[in-house]
Amino acid sequence: MALPASMRLRGHRCFNRLHRIGRRHHGDWMVLRVMPEEPRLLRPELRRHPTRCCRCALVISSKVSKRAVRRNRLRRLLHQHLRQQLEHRGDLAGRWVLISLRPEASEAEPSQLLEECDSLLSSAGLGQ
């Protein structure tokens, strides 16, 4: 299940800012970047809607897997997990989260990816 629109982070300016100044948390299979939100970087139609939770994005490049089917499965798995973990956490409103999978992530079991995601969220102060 995909992230709801209110939780999605979109736009190249947001991604560029997260890459430049976001606080990084490294794992074996992914990198998590977190920063306070900057609404001026969002598109005008998204600025009007206040966020009830943090906004999240996933980056899964073709280096992870050449097969789009595999990348989409990983994306759906992590979207569902992020939704379950963060959707009802109002205390996290005002933060942006970017998760980038490393090429080695394709060799990991789904349970290992979810465990690492949880540990990175906890180290970033977003865990439960």
From Swiss-Prot:
Keywords: Endonuclease, Hydrolase, Nuclease, RNA-binding, tRNA processing. Belongs to the RnpA family. RNaseP catalyzes the removal of the 5'-leader sequence from pre-tRNA to produce the mature 5'-terminus. It can also cleave other RNA substrates such as 4.5S RNA. The protein component plays an auxiliary but essential role in vivo by binding to the 5'-leader sequence and broadening the substrate specificity of the ribozyme. This is Ribonuclease P protein component. Consists of a catalytic RNA component (M1 or rnpB) and a protein subunit. It holds the Pfam family Ribonuclease_P. It comes from the Bacteria. It catalyses: Endonucleolytic cleavage of RNA, removing 5'-extranucleotides from tRNA precursor. GO terms for biological process: tRNA 5'-leader removal. The keyword RNA-binding applies. InterPro entries: Ribosomal_Su5_D2-typ_SF, Ribsml_uS5_D2-typ_fold_subgr, RNase_P. It comes from Parasynechococcus marenigrum (strain WH8102). One of its GO terms (molecular function) is 3'-tRNA processing endoribonuclease activity. Its EC number is 3.1.26.5. Coiled coil: none annotated. SUPFAM superfamilies: Ribosomal protein S5 domain 2-like. GO terms for cellular component: ribonuclease P complex.
